[in-house]
């Protein structure tokens, strides 16, 4: 498809614009609880956000890990709808999801590739070369709800899941802070204490 066709398709997938639900994520997950979303659709990740927008609006989904692109690499027509850094960031912030982590993949310019570097898509692929230097090409953004914000009041079970997710993504200090400042979610003092002790050990291990 041309850039014009692809942009038109993405525009049609925005909430309320879909006529023929080709992807059908919205209908498929309509009655399925989605606690966390991981999206990697090779530059088409805005489809995920548009299709599951109701999940973000209702605060059902606690977090998102999504691929993002350095949008200006594309022509102006495509840039408005692809998963550029600014497009994804603004969309998630609109529903009070905050950025907690961002990883970047840098691409060394072709003129400098006469040396041997680490290829991220196999030794025979010379198009993508990951480097500590060079221009950021793409990456991943990790968003979570912050339950300390008034707009993000979540249930006891959701808070348990959120703390577990934060711990899984090596954000134990954030989980501890949420727990410390959201005591109303944990009526059981003993459970509260035990979870804090586990998180403290995780935090300490990161600084040894």
PLM features per residue range, with description:
Residues 1-23, 32:
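Glycine-rich adenosyl-binding loop in Rossmann-like folds that engage adenosine-containing cofactors
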Residues 7-10, 29, 125-126, 192, ...:
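Intrinsically disordered, low-complexity regions
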Residues 28, 32-173, 182:
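Conserved acidic-Pro-Pro-aromatic motif
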Residues 155-208:
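C-terminal accessory extensions appended to soluble enzyme cores
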């Amino acid at each position: 498809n041309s850039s014009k066709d692809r942009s038109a398709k993405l525009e049609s997938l925005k909430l309320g614009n879909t006529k023929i639900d080709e992807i059908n994520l919205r209908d498929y997950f309509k009655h399925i609880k989605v606690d966390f979303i991981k999206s990697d659709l090779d530059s088409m990740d805005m489809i995920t956000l548009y299709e599951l927008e109701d999940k973000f609006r209702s605060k059902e989904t606690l977090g998102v890990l999504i691929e993002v692109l350095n949008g200006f690499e594309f022509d102006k027509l495509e840039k408005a709808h692809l998963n550029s850094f600014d497009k994804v960031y603004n969309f998630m912030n609109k529903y009070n999801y905050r950025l907690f982590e961002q990883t970047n993949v840098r691409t060394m310019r072709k003129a400098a590739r006469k040396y041997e570097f680490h290829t991220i898509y196999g030794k025979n692929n010379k198009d993508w070369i990951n480097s500590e230097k060079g221009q950021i090409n793409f990456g991943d953004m990790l968003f979570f709800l912050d339950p300390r914000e008034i707009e993000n009041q979540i249930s006891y079970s959701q808070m348990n899941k959120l703390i577990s997710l934060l711990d899984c993504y090596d954000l134990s200090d954030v989980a501890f802070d949420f727990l410390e400042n959201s005591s109303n979610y944990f009526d059981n003092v003993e459970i509260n204490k035990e979870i804090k002790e586990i998180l403290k050990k995780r935090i300490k291990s990161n600084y040894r």
